[in-house]
A protein has these predicted regions:
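Cysteine-nucleophile active-site neighborhood
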Residues: 30, 71-144, 209
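Acyltransferase
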Residues: 2-14, 18, 200-225
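Short, charged N-terminal beta->alpha structural module
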Residues: 29-51
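Catalytic beta-strand/loop cores that center a nucleophilic Ser/Cys/Thr
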Residues: 140-187
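Short amphipathic alpha-helix with an adjacent loop that forms part of the alpha/beta core around
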Residues: 62-71
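Phosphate-binding/catalytic loops
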Residues: 20, 149, 187, 192-203
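Short hydrophobic/Thr-rich beta-strand motif most characteristic of the beta2 strand and flanking loop
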Residues: 54-60
């Protein structure tokens, strides 16, 4: 897999979402991919490429916060450990939320929940390389066209604790055992998925990513438009 260089964009190339303008749904976008030291981050990068966007990969330890607004999307990768141990991850969420459409995957999803006031709980049983059924519990364009329920790949030992979820976050998908598999902010273009869309165990992963990349960034109707 070829290296993906981090290329800070100039303000003149900033996202039109920041000015309130609308993109055509299939327009190419520059996506800041925040690498939380996950061994399969390049699979996520490849999904972004396949969706017609240009990925710009940077370590979670080195994200220049003042350039986040210059991108059209911010994608938080999975990674080991807990969100609070992942460099500037919390700061990235705080900076991007409300400015740039934001999607967190696994660890990134957990970081979003924590920044907005939620907590995590450790699972009694680790899910590593496990295919699980996932059911949609709130309309979200991310999951448009997928079977109901749909299958996802899980690689985690922590989940967002439903009992601590703040009112500003809405659950959009659950596993069969009731674990939060996806959530979104009620008023901001911020969403997260606990499962791995880049995994071979998630057959609809590319569809989910394409919906996110092609959405116009409207808060109503979910992160997928």
């Amino acid at each position: 897999m070829s290296e993906v260089a981090f290329t800070p964009l100039e303000p003149a190339r900033a996202s039109s979402e920041a000015s309130g303008a609308k993109h055509p749904r299939r327009a190419a976008r520059n996506v800041l991919v925040v690498d939380c030291h996950d061994s399969f981050v390049y699979n996520l990068v490849q999904l972004v490429r396949e969706g017609g966007a240009v990925p710009h990969l940077v370590s979670c330890d080195e994200v220049p916060l003042d350039t986040i607004d210059h991108y059209d999307r911010v994608l938080l990768s999975p990674g080991p450990g807990l969100p609070g141990e992942s460099g500037r991850l919390f700061d990235v969420v705080r900076r991007a939320a409300g400015r740039v459409p934001l999607l967190g995957v696994c660890l990134g999803h957990q970081a979003i929940a924590e920044v907005f006031g939620g907590q995590l709980r450790q699972l009694a049983e680790v899910h590593h390389g496990v295919a699980s059924e996932c059911r949609v519990v709130a309309d979200d364009g991310l999951f448009a066209g997928l079977p109901r329920p749909f299958v996802v790949g899980r690689y985690h030992s922590w989940v967002v604790d439903r009992d601590t979820l703040p009112a500003c976050l809405e659950i959009t998908a659950l596993s069969a055992d009731g674990a939060i598999m996806a959530l979104r902010h009620r008023t901001l273009d911020v969403c997260g998925v606990q499962f791995h869309p880049e995994s071979i165990l998630t057959p609809g992963g590319s569809t989910i990513m394409n919906h996110w990349l092609c959405a116009e960034g409207e808060a109503e109707g979910g992160c997928g438009g």
